[in-house]
């Protein structure tokens, strides 16, 4: 075994979290998990079970090469090493806006008030959406579709859990989904016994990538939570700018883009409703039947605000999408842009029963 020949104490520590340490050894990544320190819903044994089940069958899932338990009750997982994740890739395409303000013009123009505060620095999104967006979208959908076909919900789809091939000079890098630490295998009796399918934990996903049904306590969710997370990633490609270096904005926010703030679910809920409208509780049956219906009605009323995106006429729906993802206008191919809009409108439903599956998205992408 390769792991038998690796001394982890001599490996480079790449990342450390509450539940895992990631090391690099040449062309390999080693994930070290403490078997006696699982923090639910993290579970090292279920993670290995899922990775072994997936094997090397999907080109968009980073394969597990080996696993090994140590005498210290740690579990070592060996993967191919990839240098960059999707969030870092998006970060590197935000460039500082170097347009300078002319102070003499302001002094000579009495109609412009003189202000003491310096202008807010802007960073412009220069990701080539014509080169990357469709390829990235298709690759991620194919990877998530494979998971769902195998009865697995990832539960933490985010750019940090999407790795890219080191060779970013190609037309479009190859993407790999990683980190199955909180994933859920609906076909694993041990996992469904510990966490019943109609009573799954809702402490899943990260920040802005949480699906709205989970935010309102629906425990019988399905793979639709992964589709929603993917929708938010898509929205990040099509934002124009940010005022904070290193921040990659999306169409919604949870307050974590503010300095010294970790964000909150309540602010995320308000942001989702501000951008996409509030449905009536009658049209959101999952929350009405299985979620925190009293909290929803108490805070937002039972009748909605009349602005829910999917209650609007089609042309209004499209304008809402384009307003929330302004760089869609930069896609040169009209058919590609229309495919994105159709898929986004299919993915944006608050009701997971109406939200498009990955297979439905792929059908749309395959259209001529």
Curated annotation (Swiss-Prot):
The keyword Repeat does not apply. Its EC number is 2.7.11.22. One of its GO terms (molecular function) is ATP binding. GO terms for cellular component: cytoplasm; nucleus. One of its GO terms (biological process) is G2/M transition of mitotic cell cycle. It comes from the Eukaryota. Signal peptide: none annotated. Keywords: ATP-binding, Kinase, Nucleotide-binding, Serine/threonine-protein kinase, Transferase. SUPFAM superfamilies: Protein kinase-like (PK-like) (SSF56112). Residues 1-368 form the Protein kinase domain. The active site is at 156 (proton acceptor). It catalyses: L-seryl-[protein] + ATP = O-phospho-L-seryl-[protein] + ADP + H(+); L-threonyl-[protein] + ATP = O-phospho-L-threonyl-[protein] + ADP + H(+). It is an enzyme of class 2 (transferase). Belongs to the protein kinase superfamily. CMGC Ser/Thr protein kinase family. CDC2/CDKX subfamily. This is Serine/threonine-protein kinase CAK1. The lineage of its organism: Eukaryota, Fungi, Dikarya, Ascomycota, Saccharomycotina. The gene is CAK1.
């Amino acid at each position: 075994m390769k792991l038998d020949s690796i001394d982890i104490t001599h490996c480079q520590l790449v990342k450390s979290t509450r539940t895992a340490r990631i090391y690099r050894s040449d062309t390999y990544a080693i994930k070290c998990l403490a078997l006696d320190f699982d923090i639910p819903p993290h579970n090292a044994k279920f993670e290995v079970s899922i990775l072994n089940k997936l094997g090397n069958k999907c080109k968009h899932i980073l394969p597990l090469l080996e696993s090994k338990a140590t005498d210290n009750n740690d579990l070592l997982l060996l993967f191919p090493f990839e240098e960059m994740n999707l969030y870092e890739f998006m970060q590197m395409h935000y460039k500082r806006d170097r347009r300078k303000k002319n102070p003499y013009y302001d002094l000579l123009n009495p109609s412009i008030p003189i202000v003491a505060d310096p202008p807010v620095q802007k960073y412009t999104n220069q990701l080539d959406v014509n080169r990357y967006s469709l390829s990235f979208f298709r690759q991620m959908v194919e990877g998530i579709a494979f998971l769902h076909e195998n009865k697995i919900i990832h539960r933490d789809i985010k750019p940090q859990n999407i790795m890219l091939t080191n060779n970013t000079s190609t037309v479009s890098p190859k993407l790999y989904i990683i980190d199955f630490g909180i994933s859920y295998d609906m076909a694993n009796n041990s996992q469904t016994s510990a966490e019943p399918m109609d009573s799954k934990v809702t402490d899943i996903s990260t920040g802005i990538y949480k699906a709205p049904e989970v935010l309102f306590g629906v425990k019988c969710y399905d793979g639709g939570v992964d589709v929603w997370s993917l929708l938010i990633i898509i929205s990040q490609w099509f934002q124009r700018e940010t005022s904070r270096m290193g921040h990659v904005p999306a169409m919604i926010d949870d307050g974590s883009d503010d300095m010294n703030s970790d964000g909150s679910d309540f602010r995320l809920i308000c942001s989702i409703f501000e951008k996409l409208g509030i449905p009536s509780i009658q049209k959101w049956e999952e929350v009405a039947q299985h979620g925190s219906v009293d909290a929803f009605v108490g805070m937002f009323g039972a009748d909605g605000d009349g602005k829910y995106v999917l209650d609007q006429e089609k042309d209004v729906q499209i304008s809402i999408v384009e307003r929330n993802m302004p760089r869609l206008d930069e896609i040169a191919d009209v058919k590609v842009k229309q495919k994105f809009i159709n898929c986004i409108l299919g993915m944006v439903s608050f009701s997971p029963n109406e939200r498009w599956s990955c297979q439905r998205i792929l059908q749309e992408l395959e259209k001529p």
